[in-house]
Amino acid sequence: MEVIKISPRGYCYGVVDAMVLALRTAQNFDLPRPIHILGMIVHNAHVVEAFEKQGIKTLDGEDRLALLDQVQEGTIIFTAHGVSPEVRKKARDKGLTVVDATCPDVTKTHDLIREKVAEGYHVLYIGKKGHPEPEGAMGIAPDHVHLVQKLEELEALDLPTDKLIVTNQTTMSQWDVKHLMDAILKRFPGVEVHNEICLATQVRQEAVAEQVGEADLCIVVGDPRSNNSNRLAQVSEEIADVPSYRIADLFELDIEWLRGKKNVAVTSGASTPTPLTKEVITFLEQFDEFNPATWEKKRTVNMAKILPTVK
């Protein structure tokens, strides 16, 4: 089978930095124990399991503030998705040692919101409900930041037009954002636009749109909770018109999807360990639908070594 390896793909710098910071925290025995991560450090269950083996427990749930009730002492790591000021204050008030792994691109958006709200602006925030990044952004100024995911939510808003900005979750599809941005500009012609899709997300989406066209199928390797992974599959189907499946790893790959296919494109989300993507590519390269000996899926990755190396 011919495999088109979409490039760039996989880990972005924000994800790598967050994981390396968490690993250094685990290796620093001057920091108080136990060590918890407030939410998934990145949206990948394999990564979470690998950190558990490093002695770092992940607290999973949508409400970061409520999750903090489970921690009475030790060190807390904030994830790459960022947290609200209220969460930061609660962690300090509990006497916890804080390690902040917030992605710099997310911090940039938080700073923008903070600055504009101080100037009297309201903020339209395009994002996905239930995702930790919008939770953190909205928490900066709950009365002034308005989450928009669908057009009908926009139509229900009654906001002043003289001091209004629009920004977005960094991992959204740029085409989804444009769709809502256009509607917002039509509804609020004077709105100030700040497109905050991070460069890593943007170039990975553009790579799929531009490189997947000759494929019969696109496989996206990424966790089901990874927004950017799901968006890559969406880009393949809606922009490039190529059928796509998102899989967490090789063992979610259905052989039936491959029947009659000659060219398969592979990409991966920004939080997907590189070895897992390579494992999928290696399997596809040897796959022959007429040779059952090539159908068996075997784990070739050492799952204890999927985290980045701390230098």
UniProtKB/Swiss-Prot annotation:
Transmembrane segments: none annotated. It comes from Brevibacillus brevis (strain 47 / JCM 6285 / NBRC 100599). Dimethylallyl diphosphate binds at H43, H81, H131, S226, N228, S271. This is 4-hydroxy-3-methylbut-2-enyl diphosphate reductase. Pathway: Isoprenoid biosynthesis; dimethylallyl diphosphate biosynthesis; dimethylallyl diphosphate from (2E)-4-hydroxy-3-methylbutenyl diphosphate: step 1/1; Isoprenoid biosynthesis; isopentenyl diphosphate biosynthesis via DXP pathway; isopentenyl diphosphate from 1-deoxy-D-xylulose 5-phosphate: step 6/6. It comes from the Bacteria. GO terms for biological process: dimethylallyl diphosphate biosynthetic process; isopentenyl diphosphate biosynthetic process, methylerythritol 4-phosphate pathway; terpenoid biosynthetic process. InterPro entries: LytB/IspH. Keywords: 4Fe-4S, Iron, Iron-sulfur, Isoprene biosynthesis, Metal-binding, Oxidoreductase. The keyword Metal-binding applies.
